[in-house]
Design a protein with these regions (language model features):
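Membrane-interface micro-motifs in multi-pass membrane enzymes
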Residues: 56-62, 110-123, 160-161
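Transmembrane alpha-helical segments
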Residues: 69, 73, 120-132, 167-175
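Short helix-capping/hinge motifs at transmembrane helix termini and TM-loop junctions
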Residues: 6-15, 77-78, 100-101, 132-133
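Alpha-helical transmembrane segments of multi-pass integral membrane proteins
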Residues: 122, 147-176
Length: 176
């Protein structure tokens, strides 16, 4: 809302009349129901991704889907093992499809590969919460995890799969 009413009018290169009459201005409100639209007329026209007001909007439907899955897992009363099962499903989908897919599979303006790949990290992080791994979140373990993770970079497939566990641990350990 602030992007449309404050940022857009201040930064647009088109006239105010053109800005407010534009279909793109009204269309930007579709972001409120997670139908992602990046553009406002005449705003950021010279960026590498021209006209994109907020290029991180792609993550909103992905995040919403992850939180919705957490609610569903909680609703069926299988939080600990349900979260682990979700993490394993997302890992299997990542290994079996998302890394090998050559074409985007877009639903509701969201690339399903991104949903799967982000789902791995989200649910591994959720597992760390469920299984109380946070007792290991300190600088010593974080630095050790970074060193082990980087040592695995010699073997790309192992490194990628290890990233699913190491990156959430490292981020959460440094963040606490």
């Amino acid at each position: 809302v602030l992007s449309v009413f404050v940022l857009g009018p201040l930064l647009t290169e088109v006239t105010q009349a053109e800005y407010w009459k534009s279909e793109q201005t009204r269309g930007y409100f579709t972001n409120l129901y997670l139908y992602i639209t990046y553009y406002l007329p005449g705003v950021f026209t010279h960026n590498k991704l021209p006209n994109a007001v907020n290029s991180s909007l792609w993550s909103l439907p992905v995040e919403f889907a992850m939180y919705l899955l957490i609610v569903i897992i909680g609703f069926v009363r299988a939080p600990k093992w349900g979260v682990l099962a979700a993490a394993l499903v997302f890992m299997a989908l990542s290994a079996g499809w998302a890394f090998q897919a050559t074409e985007m599979l877009v639903y509701y303006r969201t690339d399903m590969r991104q949903l799967v790949l982000c789902g791995v990290y989200f649910f591994v992080g959720a597992c760390m919460s469920q299984f109380k791994v946070d007792r290991f979140f300190n600088l010593t373990y974080a630095l050790a995890a970074v060193m082990v993770w980087l040592a695995l970079s010699r073997w790309i497939v192992v490194f990628i799969m290890a990233s699913w566990v190491f990156l959430p641990f490292i981020v959460l350990a440094f963040g606490t």
